[in-house]
């Protein structure tokens, strides 16, 4: 990204952490990560979107498996504040601002041989098996 002449960005360590909850009805503070391991041919993405003024957080885990199938889960988990990225079995921890973090998930995921089944999420969740996934990654 090229900034206009005279403009600059200054990120402070505290900018990496949670922000004060605003009064906006649709206030949303979210964080997500895309990951890929070319050696293991596995990738995925993980997201938490806090909507504290609505009383919930959206949690999504999606792992692309080497055989083309996916492990997926989405939840709207109850939250009461915007104090942390921790909802629905997922947690993001800032270990060192802008350098290191931990992604944790402990819960069920849907195993889908055919990812296009998510065109109809209700049907996909009814017709595919679930398994437990413990994830703790830095």
Where are these regions (language model features)?
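Targeting-peptide/extracellular-domain and disordered-appendage signature
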Residues: 1-138
